[in-house]
């Protein structure tokens, strides 16, 4: 890849010969969706083959490109993403796009897969699965634009950094290839602003140093110059006497055996624009001027603690989420004259100022300041002319008032039930669900379950959320549901307990199931422990997560769990052995009198109906 990036014809024959010697590049290469199919390998291998074809038009690699593209497209999960491996139909009741092995989605492995699919499309590959995968990826990665860098998997945007182990650079390239100008511009700037964190990264910084410079280069020559001005030392200090490069990392599992020379060469060749990952045919309309590039690069060392209140106030309109957030927290932590101006921003500010103002009066805002904005925020919360995303942000902020905001609990329930065609990933509903749980942990005790039809309709909708964090908010809302009301939510709780829905777009987190089992245990309903144990029968899901889930469940049942201990003892708890053994011992010694008669699910479901 590095040799291709030079654009020098003398290197093309070397690359051509090398590719023909690679088993994984042969026309008859065998790929699989099974456990042996590696998303890491398939994604990067396909990028090389595609870039090689687009540079040389050598038809030899087209059969392999077609196989990689279709296999990857078929191997994506319901979110359109990948983990260490593919979503194997054999582990998902024969269905495509089911659940991934282990702890599921990782953006660090998914982004190269997605980039390779976009390149394969440029190579002429056509397949319905490929088209669907590209559209899903565009929606998912586009959802982070303007909000933060990429997280580990299907999580919230990371607003505390400009970059996360090269993922801002990868996202810039992916969205450039997907013709998302706004997204490419945003993430190329995020990459340019992260020059001070080039030696950071989960299990090592290899991907950071590979991709970040490539992403920054999409912002044009001035951005490339500014980036290399700040990072040239890295290349120099890693250079060896023989012209190669070292990979220096003290991290465990830090990509041993990787060729770091190729990473440095690809970055050195950014100005040549010979590869698509190096900015070939990049959109020049997003190129930064020299002054703008210097300003963005300077954000890497911005210390908001040294800024005046006036300077911090101006940053509430900054395009970078990290800068705005730091300005909010720093300004709020000092005595200043701008509180009333920030209240006015809620209604009269720019889009970014309004977002900053909502955050200012949210989490950990001093009550004396937050109280000044309640009336304005409540009016916006109820205003149907406001964007739904803004109303959800306001719900999140106002929820931090706790009991002081209970009057708005029904308004948020109604927002959950409103149709939101723009909320393709359910992010707005998830935020509203979190607001409800933050505002009141037990709405029954607080007297907030007045309109049962409204309350349970919102809870049921959230429990059907495709993301685990969304489902968890729905179950938490009803964690104290009385038996006479169980029929309102019984089917939703059972669906979460059974956990068989392969259309979930996040499923690694067992929090919804733990909450559901808690309801079963509190209402003395049979099947809770069996539901928890069923997770161990699935090939997907991380074993450690399953063990921790079961350790949360068993103590809730206490003496009622004695009958299941023989099965529990068959499980190897690994590093959790100490806690595991104590839980088992506590159950074995529990007073038998404490055991209660269990209700069958249908009995519990019908209890309230028959009263």
Identify the residue ranges that each predicted region occupies.
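Structural helix-adjacent loops and short alpha-helical linkers that scaffold large soluble proteins
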Residues: 3-17, 52-69, 118-138, 175-190, ...
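Extended ligand-binding clefts on enzyme/binding-domain cores
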Residues: 79, 90-209, 219, 226, ...
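Long, well-ordered core segments of solenoidal/helical folds
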Residues: 13-31, 64-82, 132-150, 179-200, ...
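Short inter-helical turns and helix N-cap capping residues of alpha-solenoid HEAT/ARM repeat scaffolds
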Residues: 38, 106, 319-320, 349-350, ...
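Structural detector for internal amphipathic alpha-helices that build alpha-solenoid repeat scaffolds
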Residues: 1-2, 174, 217-218, 295-304, ...
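Well-ordered alpha-helical segments within folded domains of soluble proteins
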Residues: 1-4, 38-51, 105-118, 163-176, ...
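Terminal, non-catalytic domain-edge segments
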Residues: 180-189, 215-218, 222-318, 581-611
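Amphipathic alpha-helical scaffolding segments comprising HEAT/armadillo-like alpha-solenoid repeats
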Residues: 12, 278-279, 305-315, 335-347, ...
């Amino acid at each position: 890849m590095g040799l291709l990036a030079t654009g020098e014809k003398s290197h093309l024959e070397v690359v051509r010969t090398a590719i023909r010697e690679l088993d994984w590049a042969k026309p008859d290469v065998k790929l699989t969706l099974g456990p042996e199919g590696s998303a890491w390998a398939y994604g990067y291998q396909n990028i090389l083959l595609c870039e090689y074809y687009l540079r040389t038009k050598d038809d030899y690699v087209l059969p392999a490109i077609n196989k990689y593209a279709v296999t990857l497209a078929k191997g994506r999960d319901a979110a359109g993403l990948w983990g260490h491996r593919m979503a194997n139909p054999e582990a998902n009741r024969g269905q495509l796009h089911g659940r991934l092995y282990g702890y599921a989605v990782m953006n660090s492995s998914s982004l190269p897969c997605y980039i390779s699919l976009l390149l394969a499309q440029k190579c002429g590959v056509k397949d319905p699965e490929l088209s669907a995968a590209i559209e899903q990826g565009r929606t998912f990665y586009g959802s982070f634009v303007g909000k933060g860098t990429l997280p580990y998997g299907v999580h919230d945007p990371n607003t505390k950094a400009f970059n996360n182990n090269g993922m801002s650079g990868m996202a810039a390239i992916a969205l450039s290839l997907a013709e998302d100008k706004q997204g490419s511009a945003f993430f190329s700037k995020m990459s340019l602003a992260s020059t001070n964190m080039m030696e950071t990264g989960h299990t090592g910084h290899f991907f950071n140093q590979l991709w970040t410079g490539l992403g920054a280069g999409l912002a044009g020559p001035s951005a490339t110059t500014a980036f290399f001005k700040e990072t040239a030392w890295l290349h120099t200090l890693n250079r060896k006497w023989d012209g190669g490069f070292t990979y220096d990392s003290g991290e465990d599992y830090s990509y041993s055996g990787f060729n770091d020379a190729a990473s440095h060469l690809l970055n050195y060749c950014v100005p040549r624009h010979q590869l698509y990952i190096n900015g070939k045919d990049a959109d020049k309309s997003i190129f930064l001027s020299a002054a703008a590039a210097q300003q963005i690069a300077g954000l890497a060392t911005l210390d908001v603690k040294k800024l005046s209140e006036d300077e911090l106030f101006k940053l509430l309109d900054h395009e970078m989420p990290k800068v705005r957030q730091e300005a909010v927290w720093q300004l709020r932590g000092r005595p200043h004259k701008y509180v009333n101006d920030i209240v006015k921003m809620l209604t009269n500010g720019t889009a970014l100022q309004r977002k900053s103002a909502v955050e200012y009066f949210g989490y950990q805002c001093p009550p004396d300041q937050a109280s000044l904005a309640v009336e304005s925020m409540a009016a916006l919360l109820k205003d149907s002319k406001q964007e739904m995303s803004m109303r959800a942000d306001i719900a999140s902020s106002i929820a931090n008032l706790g009991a002081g905001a209970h009057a708005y609990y029904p308004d948020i329930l109604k927002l959950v039930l409103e149709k939101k065609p723009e909320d393709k990933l359910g992010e707005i509903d998830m935020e509203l669900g979190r607001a409800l749980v933050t505002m009141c942990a037990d709405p029954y005790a607080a007297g907030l379950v007045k309109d049962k039809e409204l309350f349970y309709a919102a809870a049921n909708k959230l429990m059907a959320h495709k993301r685990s964090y969304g489902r968890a908010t729905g179950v938490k809302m009803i964690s104290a549901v009385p038996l006479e009301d169980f029929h309102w939510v019984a089917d939703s709780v059972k669906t979460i307990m059974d956990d068989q829905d392969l259309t979930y777009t996040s499923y690694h987190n067992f929090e919804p199931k733990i909450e559901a089992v808690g309801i079963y245990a509190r209402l003395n309903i049979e099947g809770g422990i069996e539901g928890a144990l069923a997770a161990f029968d699935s090939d997907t899901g991380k074993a450690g997560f399953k063990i921790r889930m079961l350790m949360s469940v068993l103590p809730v049942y206490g003496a009622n769990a004695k009958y299941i201990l023989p099965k529990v003892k068959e499980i190897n708890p690994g590093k959790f052995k100490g806690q595991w053994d104590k839980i088992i011992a506590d159950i074995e010694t529990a007073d038998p009198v404490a055991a209660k008669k269990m209700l069958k699910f249908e009995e519990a479901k019908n209890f309230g109906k028959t009263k």
